[in-house]
Amino acid sequence: GFPIKCALIAEGGERDAALSHLVDDLNVADVRIKYVPRAQLDALSSHGAHQGIALEVGNFPYADVADILDRAGDGPALVVVLDHVTDDGNFGAIVRSAEVVGAAGVIIANKRAAGVTVGSYKTSAGAVMHLPIAQVPNIARALDDLKAAGFWVGGASEHAEGSCWDAPFEGRVALVMGSEGDGISRLVLEKCDFLTKLPQRGMTESLNVAQATTALCFEWLRRNAGELMGEE
């Protein structure tokens, strides 16, 4: 998780039993502790919802693609690849869905893309702490690494001829989702082994990228449930 740089504790908090135990744990972990006026914590938090403590944390420890491949092992695996998704809320929701279905990890661009922030942490319901997330300088090159590890690369596109019900989602799949406005970029699209889309009957143009990713992740899980979950 996030490395803790410093703990800010409300003055007088050491007399609170729960906080006292927490202070002991922080001391064991060799975390620096500062006692500050409660008003300072009020100013740092939302509506004073701090329970007498706030943590100053360092940068999120992103994983490497190699870490995701190690987690994927040799059997069926899903890696979600985001081609410059920019909204923190969408990113957090995608990570939550990917973690719920047991994906091996999420790969994102290191520039012009949403990453792990306080907002995306909340939207993910903490899932960012349980799933490797790799930042890479080149999405297309990361897909080459996944292909070399036996992954079949599928891109979500409204221009796909067939729906996800017919897509080759069995086994090792890298699911590529494009940005909210532009979709998958040309260079990344060229790396895709197949394109897929969600079937729909209504009048609304489409789902947003987070909703679409969730649906496709669960379709992958359904296809591989027999091997992954012991279902017939």
Segments and roles (model prediction):
Residues T86-I94, N138, L207-Q211:
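Amphipathic alpha-helical repeat scaffolds
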